[in-house]
Amino acid sequence: LAANGEVWKGTGGETIRYYDENIANLDPQHQNENTKSLALRIAYGPFRYYCGGDAVGSLLDSNGEKVNIEEKVGEACGTVDVSKANHHAYKDAMTEGFLRHIQAKQYVIPVWDHEHIQPDVIQRMVTMTADKSDPVVYVTHMPQARQEKYASESWMQSVSPVSGHVVIKVFDEGRKYSIYVLSAEDERCLVKAVYGPYESGNK
């Protein structure tokens, strides 16, 4: 979908090289590695999975207007079943525009810092997800202090109560998938929780 600021247009082999659109994008003071993130959409049968690294930030187009790279990547990607959150779902990520394009049913947030638990962002992810019957958000680590602080927040009801390694198991030739949460305290990777199976195909 994207790499080094070059984003697929969504059909055929055409791309837009946003760093070439405006010379100001090449100014070292405005260089941002996040806009250069590699973004992938993985397909197996009807199942779709998105992973976009730290794909956030803006670049200038030929008219000097700001272009949100995350939203352009989401537009190229289209709807998916499961999405890894961009940039740890930090406050500059998972914009409304991006979420509207991918319409994922579940999101995985890789967390290694307390600040990666951003209430406004998670609330937005939960609110813009149609199916809330099961956990919508899976975090690799939920700091105890954050869990206690936000325990009464409505969005916490849509966050998996267990955290750890998140594994997506796709089967039946891509028609179904389950989400496993494994222990991350040591190398045993014990199964802590299993969610699903879910039907693939986000319409």
What residue ranges belong to the model's regions?
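Flexible, acidic/histidine-containing loops and adjacent segments that form or flank the divalent-metal
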Residues: 1-62, 129-203
